[in-house]
């Protein structure tokens, strides 16, 4: 495709009505995120129902979650740092620069994959023990992680490079990237876990095969002729002026996801102290439900990101403001509906992951506390993703650091001492307290930074 034609094709991001455009991009992306949620939790759903050992196996795989989050965080750092910069370059009609960013990001993902796989295969058992595995759960955790580690390269390329597909406006293609792997995982899981009797090893193998299928789809598209930005060998040589800004912008996304890993370790250690394996197992369920809550919000933000980034690059302040306003409204509506469902029907969510009566009863009470202020969290997600879409790395990092490191981690250890009569539930209470304070901070910071960005666009 000729460069001039490419420019005309992508100009819809600056011309189509914002409302219609947002939903055209967001609905497939949200569907992809929901499918991705099933992709991530389907292992836990099947594992939790393994006869005789489901509860312990679920807890063991739950201990692997901090590691899986770190792997995803590296992919997100490269993808979330590179994709907005590439879209901004497209808005400025600088396709050569955009393809340079794309090529460098592929190389970064390959390098990161080799390093992560080596570390996990060499030190996996020691890491799991440090992350909260007990004598009862360590073998289940190792069985899953040893197989998952082999497929790290597929995770990196699928999650990291799929953002470049969505960022160009190919939301349906991005959705299919996730759908292919999700359907494969849902089909393969019961076959490997139950029919072949592989247990948690089967779940890990199903995940690796599914990710490989998604990876093949993503890379085939970005190497093909239908994409605006194409992977080319000459652009894969790392350049400092591309790598440093990309990783700097993606650092906020990395902090958000890797901090989830650190937080998971903190939760597990504190819960193991006050409630044993039962409390850690419940946390596996709570984080799975939280994934369900967060991924559609992330999908909406990813649908809005190309519109905001493109029009920011084109200095169209009106469309940027209109897109953000609509994003906040939709996020709030979704958050409120989900909050009501969790508070009214917690057992529906918990029973998806376990048939153990004790874990089911405990999990319902913990879930209500853990997601007590979910109804306002859509505001922070909208601010966070808009900061990234505008290329404001500093503000994105500030929001990420505030919620995770300054608020939540200290509260995990502080609240059990303040509520000594029920320290176990006080651990779960740390999440809603941190959410409330971080939403206030993110909204205040965004009010100042967004006005500044609008003035810059209007001043050009």
Locations of regions flagged by a protein language model:
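Transmembrane helical elements of multi-pass membrane transporters/channels
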Residues: 24-43, 147, 181, 210-214, ...
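Short runs within selected transmembrane alpha-helices of multi-pass transporters and secretion channels
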Residues: 79, 148-166, 177-182, 203-216, ...
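N-terminal transmembrane alpha-helices
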Residues: 13-45, 49-53, 66-81, 85, ...
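Short alpha-helical transmembrane segments in multi-pass integral membrane proteins
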Residues: 1-29, 86-151, 195-250, 308-373, ...
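Small-residue hotspots at the loop-to-helix junctions and early N-terminal turns
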Residues: 55-66, 141, 145, 204, ...
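Helix-terminus/linker motif at the lipid-water interface of multi-pass membrane proteins
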Residues: 34, 38-58, 128-135, 191-198, ...
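Small-residue-rich hydrophobic transmembrane alpha-helices
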Residues: 58-118, 155-174, 282-340, 344-346, ...
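Residue-level signal for transmembrane alpha-helical positions in Major Facilitator Superfamily
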Residues: 23, 38-39, 78, 119-123, ...
